[in-house]
Every structure is written in structure tokens, then in C-alpha cells.
């Protein structure tokens, strides 16, 4: 029988509410060595995901802005000012809302193939519009190794 997402997904996950300040999310990313944090509402409905990249996009000027405004070169403190401005914004202003997800009854191999195709490391697992876990490529690999490599030669 093929392994399902529910067989190997992580049920303990970190999520924040949409009004959580970016500085708190940044602290969680650093403290727990995460690449992203899920954003849910009070009923655990997945609203989005926020990544280091999302925060960087808010913090750094885009290329056109940088080229038009030389003040970033002349006054590097502008980045610090910009950082101070965005750190208190709610995470909903930085998160990605179009999140690729999977379901607990999906085949784990299918979820792994989706992650590989989309170049992402983990997928939120959603059931009945509620976040129930996350699955990573590592979860799938470990699951396969444990299932099919019962005995490893010395």
C-alpha cells in the first residue's frame, strides 16, 4: 500500500495569526531555524505563509526603486529606517496568500513530486479547509527509508 501524506506529516507545526507583527515572526524564524511560518485564523484556516524572502521583499528596495533613488547609496541608514517601519506591520501585509497545499489522504509520493516541481521544501496539509499539519521532502524521505529499508547493511 502506498504511503499517504497523513502517515508521515508533522502534526505539530508553528502558525501565527494575521495580525502578528513581522518582528515576532522574524524572531520565530530565527529562534527555530525556520524558512517560513504558516498564517492561520482562529479556526485554523490557512490564510497564507510568510518566508524570509517575503520579509526581504518588504525590507529591501526593488531594483527599479534602488536605481531611481540614489539616497540608498548615500544614506545606508535608510534601510535601517525602512526596517523599523516594517517590523511592526502585521504579517498579513507580507505573507503569500496563494499557498500550494496537499491533503492527508493524498499519496506522499505525489506531494513529494509537487514539492520538487515547485521547488519548495514543505507543504501545508489541509483538511476541510483547516490546517492539520505540514509535510516536507525530508518527512517523505524518512518515511520511505523506514518503510523500504528495514535492514541497512553495515
What are these regions (language model features)?
Residues 62-72:
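Short, charge-rich, low-complexity interaction segments located
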Residues 1-28, 34, 39-42, 46-47, ...:
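Bateman/CBS regulatory modules and CBS-like beta-alpha motifs in cytosolic regions of diverse proteins
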Residues 120-121:
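Structured functional modules or segments
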Residues 34, 38, 46-61, 124, ...:
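Short beta->alpha transition motifs characteristic of CBS
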Amino acid at each position: 500500500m502506498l504511503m499517504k501524506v497523513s502517515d508521515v506529516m508533522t502534526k505539530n507545526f508553528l502558525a501565527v495569526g494575521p495580525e502578528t507583527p513581522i518582528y515576532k515572526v522574524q524572531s520565530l524564524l530565527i529562534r527555530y531555524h525556520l524558512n517560513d511560518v504558516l498564517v492561520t485564523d482562529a479556526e485554523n484556516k490557512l490564510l497564507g505563509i510568510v518566508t524570509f524572502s517575503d520579509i526581504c521583499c518588504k525590507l529591501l528596495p526593488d531594483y527599479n526603486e534602488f536605481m531611481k533613488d540614489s539616497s540608498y547609496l548615500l544614506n545606508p541608514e535608510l534601510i535601517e529606517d525602512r526596517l523599523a517601519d516594517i517590523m511592526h506591520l502585521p504579517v498579513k501585509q507580507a505573507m503569500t496568500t496563494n499557498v500550494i497545499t496537499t491533503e492527508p489522504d493524498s499519496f506522499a509520493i505525489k506531494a513529494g513530486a509537487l514539492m520538487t516541481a515547485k521547488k519548495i521544501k514543505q507543504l501545508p496539509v489541509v483538511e476541510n479547509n483547516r490546517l492539520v499539519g505540514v509535510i516536507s521532502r525530508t518527512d517523505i524521505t524518512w518515511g520511505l527509508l523506514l518503510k523500504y529499508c528495514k535492514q541497512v547493511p553495515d
